[in-house]
């Protein structure tokens, strides 16, 4: 009996002596003080930075624009509704952009020529003369959009190229990617094929 009374007294003393902040809901603050922030790795920081520069995310409607093509004609993105569109931002000085473009003719334009697909590459921040010299050197003949003031690019992103925005038939972005990796390009081609099959 004495032991039981001592145990009850000890429990009562414990409750009386607990800090008031725990009773008043301050337990979260106490828990936060006990938590340790895990520093981000350099790779985590780089990925967060890349993601933050993407203004149009997957699931969003693609912002509409009108772009002047290399041949002087114009195309408005919304006029392509009903087609799957791959919007690609690139520049002639960008090595991964140039590497990605080497795969476009055979793996996109020729492959999907008889299907409702449009490849819309937009040169970011370059004048027509620069793109003309690049086309002459490479022999590319597919349509290329010009965005010398980066007005179109700034609707979609704040930094980094190459960038791809895969847009479905309703005008919704279903994939947004940064950079060029051969395996990711393969996956992109497969995704286009799947969208065209829907």
Annotate each PLM feature:
Residues 56-59, 64-85:
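A short beta-strand-turn-helix
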Residues 133-141, 147-195:
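Thiol/disulfide oxidoreductase modules built on the thioredoxin-like
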Residues 98-138, 148-155, 190:
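Structural microenvironment flanking redox-active thiols in thiol-disulfide oxidoreductases
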Residues 65, 80, 89-93, 134, ...:
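Conserved hydrophobic/aromatic "anchor" residues
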Residues 86-88, 121, 166:
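Hydrophobic beta-strand core positions in alpha/beta domains
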Residues 80-83, 114, 140-141, 158-159:
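Active-site acidic short loop of glycosyltransferases
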Residues 81-82, 89-106:
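Conserved redox-active cysteine motifs that mediate thiol-disulfide chemistry
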Residues 1-61, 189, 198:
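N-terminal targeting signals for export/organelle localization
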């Amino acid at each position: 009996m004495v032991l039981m009374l001592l145990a009850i007294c000890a429990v009562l003393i414990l409750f009386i002596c607990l800090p008031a902040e725990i009773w008043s809901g301050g337990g979260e603050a106490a828990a936060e003080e006990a938590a340790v922030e895990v520093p981000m790795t350099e790779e985590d920081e780089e990925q967060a930075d890349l993601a933050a520069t993407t203004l149009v995310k997957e699931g969003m409607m693609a912002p509409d624009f009108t772009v002047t093509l290399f041949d002087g004609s114009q195309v408005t993105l919304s006029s392509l509704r009903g087609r799957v569109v791959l919007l690609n931002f690139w520049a002639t000085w960008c090595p991964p952009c140039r590497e990605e473009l080497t795969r476009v003719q055979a793996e996109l334009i020729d492959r999907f020529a008889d299907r409702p697909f449009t490849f819309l590459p937009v040169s970011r921040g370059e004048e027509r003369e620069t793109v003309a010299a690049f086309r002459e050197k490479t022999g590319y003949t597919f349509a290329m959009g010009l965005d010398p003031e980066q007005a179109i690019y700034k609707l979609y992103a704040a930094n980094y190229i190459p960038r791809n925005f895969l847009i479905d038939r309703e005008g919704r972005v279903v994939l947004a990617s940064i950079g060029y990796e051969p395996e990711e390009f393969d996956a992109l081609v497969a995704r286009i094929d799947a969208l065209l099959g829907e």
